[in-house]
Regions:
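Generic signal for short, ordered secondary-structure residues
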Residues: 101, 105, 140, 231-234, ...
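Short glycine/serine/threonine-biased micro-segments
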Residues: 12, 59, 68, 108, ...
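C-terminal transmembrane helix pair
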Residues: 114-115, 122-161, 167-197, 323-409
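Membrane-embedded alpha-helical segments and adjacent helix-loop junctions characteristic
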Residues: 29-128, 257-346
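Signature of multi-pass transmembrane helix bundles
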Residues: 1-54, 163-294, 311-313, 385-409
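Generic hydrophobic alpha-helical membrane-segment signal
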Residues: 2, 91, 98-100, 135-140, ...
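Hydrophobic alpha-helical segments, principally membrane-spanning helices and signal/leader peptides
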Residues: 36-39, 46, 95-97, 132-140, ...
Length: 409
C-alpha cells in the first residue's frame, strides 16, 4: 500500500511542478523532458531485465546443482540456529536458508551480479511457503530489508570510481562505508524485528551480532595495514575466489552424490528467462515513475529546500551538496552512481562532498529497485511494511554516513 501511494505521488508531484514551471516561468521544456524520461526509463527497465537473463540463467542453474548435491541443505543446517530466530516462519532446515545466506554473502562481497539471482531464488522458495500469493510474508520482508540496507564489506566498485576520478587515496572511504552500512543493516534488522515482534535479545542473536562486529573489526584492521593497490587487489581476489569456490564446491558435492550435474544445471537454468520476463512490468513501473519525478525538477527542489532549512536552523550545510546521491540511491542505482560521479567532478574526489557522496553510495542500496525486482519476480503486490522498514534502514545509513564523515574527514 505504501508503494502505491509513493508511486502515485511521483507522478502527481511531477505534474504539478511542471504546470507551475509552465505557468509562472514559461518553461516549455518541462513536459517534453518528462515524456522523454518515460520512454528512456521504459527502455532502461527492459534492458536491465534483458541483461539479467544470462546471469539469472547461470545462477539458477548453479543453485539447482547445489540443491541436488545437498550443499544448500548443508548450509541450511549450519545456519538454522540463527535463521530460526531471524526468520521464525521458515521451517527449520528449509533449503531457502542456504539461498538467503549465499545472497547476503554475495552482497557483502560486492558481487551484485551473483547476489540478485540468488536473491530471486530465495524469493521463489519463500513463495512456496506463502498462503497469500500476492502478499509479502514476514520472512520476505526481513530478507528484503537485509538487501536494501546494503551491508557491504568490500566496496570495490566505489574505490575504482574514486581512483578514476583522481583521488589521492581511493580507499580512504573504505572504513566509513563499512561503519555506515553496518548501522543501516543493524537498524533494518531491529525495526523489522519490532514490526514482526521478533525477540532479538536472545543468546543466539547476541552472539551472532557480536561475531559480526568482531569480523568487521578484523576486516578494518587487516585492510588498514595495506596500501591502496594491495587493498583493491586483495579485496577483488578474495571476493572472486570465494565465489568460484562456491561454484566448484556445488559441482563436486553433486558429483559425489552421483548426480547428473549437467542435467541438473539445465533444469535449473530453464527458469532464468521466465523469471527475467516476470520482472519487466514491475521494473518499468518504478523506473518510469522515478524518471518523471527527476525530470520535473522535483528532486532539485527537494535538495534546495533541505539546504535552506539546515541553514535556517544554523546547521552546517557542507553535507547538503552530497544529498542528491543519498536521495537518489533508494530510487535508482545508476542515478545515484551518476550523482556520486558528478559530486566528485564538481567538488573534487578528495573534497568532503566527494567523499561523503561515495559513502552514501556504499551505505545503502536501491530500495525501490529491489522491491520491484524481488517482489515482482513472484507476483507480490501487497508489500506491507517492507517499504517503511527499508527506508528507515536507508535513513539510518544516511545519518550514520554524515556523522562518520564529519568524524573522519
Amino acid at each position: 500500500m505504501v508503494l502505491n501511494y509513493i508511486w502515485i505521488a511521483f507522478f502527481v508531484v511531477a505534474f504539478v511542478i511542471a504546470i507551475c514551471k509552465l505557468e509562472f516561468w514559461g518553461d516549455v521544456e518541462a513536459f517534453p523532458e518528462m515524456m522523454n524520461s518515460t520512454f528512456s526509463s521504459s527502455k532502461t527497465a527492459f534492458e536491465i531485465s534483458l541483461g539479467l537473463t544470462g546471469v539469472l540463467t547461470l545462477w539458477l542453474g548453479i543453485m539447482r546443482v547445489g540443491e541436488k548435491g545437498g550443499a544448500v541443505n548443508a548450509l541450511s543446517r549450519l545456519l538454522s540456529p540463527v535463521f530460526v530466530k531471524l526468520f521464525p516462519d521458515i521451517p527449520k532446515g528449509h533449503p531457502v536458508t542456504g539461498s538467503i545466506f549465499m545472497n547476503v554473502a554475495a552482497n557483502m562481497l560486492g558481487l551484485d551480479n551473483a547476489a540478485t539471482p540468488l536473491g530471486l531464488k530465495a524469493m521463489e522458495q519463500m513463495q512456496t511457503l506463502n498462503n497469500k500469493k500476492d502478499t509479502a510474508t514476514n520472512p520476505m520482508i526481513m530478507f528484503l530489508v537485509l538487501n536494501t540496507s546494503g551491508l557491504t564489506l568490500i566496496p570495490v566498485s566505489i574505490m575504482v570510481y574514486r581512483a578514476q576520478m583522481g583521488a589521492a587515496q581511493p580507499t580512504d572511504i573504505f572504513v566509513p562505508i563499512l561503519l555506515a552500512t553496518f548501522f543501516s543493516t543493524l537498524t533494518g534488522i531491529i525495526v523489522t524485528g519490532i514490526y514482526q515482534r521478533i525477540n532479538l535479545l536472545n543468546r543466539v542473536m547476541l552472539l551472532t551480532l557480536g561475531g559480526i562486529c568482531a569480523l568487521v573489526a578484523a576486516i578494518i584492521w587487516g585492510f588498514s595495514q595495506m596500501d591502496k593497490e594491495s587493498m583493491n587487489t586483495v579485496s577483488t581476489l578474495v571476493a572472486n575466489i570465494l565465489l568460484m569456490t562456491i561454484i566448484v564446491g556445488f559441482i563436486l558435492a553433486a558429483a559425489r552424490k552421483r548426480v547428473n550435474v549437467y542435467d541438473a544445471f539445465i533444469e535449473g537454468a530453464k527458469d532464468g528467462f521466465s523469471t527475467a520476463v516476470r520482472i519487466i512490468p514491475y521494473l518499468v513501473a518504478i523506473l518510469v515513475a522515478i524518471g518523471v519525478f527527476r525530470a520535473s525538477g522535483a528532486m532539485d527542489m527537494l535538495i534546495d529546500g533541505v539546504k535552506y532549512m539546515v541553514a535556517a536552523l544554523g546547521g552546517d550545510t557542507d553535507f547538503v551538496g552530497a544529498l542528491p546521491t543519498a536521495l537518489m540511491k533508494p530510487l535508482s542505482g545508476s542515478g545515484a552512481r551518476g550523482m556520486m560521479v558528478d559530486a566528485m567532478t564538481t567538488y573534487g574526489a578528495d573534497s568532503f562532498i566527494g567523499r561523503l557522496s561515495c559513502v552514501f553510495q556504499g551505505s545503502t542500496d536501491t530500495t525501490f529497485y529491489i522491491i520491484a525486482v524481488y517482489f515482482g519476480s513472484v507476483g507480490i503486490r501487497h508489500t506491507r511494511h517492507a517499504v517503511t522498514c527499508g527506508l528507515l534502514a536507508d535513513l539510518a545509513g544516511v545519518i550514520a554516513a554524515i556523522a562518520i564523515c564529519y568524524l573522519f574527514f
